[in-house]
Amino acid sequence: MDIEKAKEVLEKTDTEIFVEKNKVMRGLQILAKYEENVMPQFDHDIIWASDFEETASQMPEEDVIQMAKLGWFYDEENDCWAHC
């Protein structure tokens, strides 16, 4: 998927009514389909994982939407996926 389109999809996806358990783990599983060795980094209130452009460019729109629904977003400062 085009990177700018992926960012747009993330911003527009309604996540209010989406309920799923293990949102962090599920997002990491999706990322693992597009990156051989996902190595997340953790802080007290955020998780960062995978180069955004590298993974999003390989994803179909459905996976980008799923990531948004799971609460993953584009961290512009670090150019990666993030979850709070």
Task: Describe the residue ranges of each PLM region.
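Short, compact, well-ordered microdomains
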Residues: 55-84
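N-terminal leader/targeting segments
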Residues: 1-46
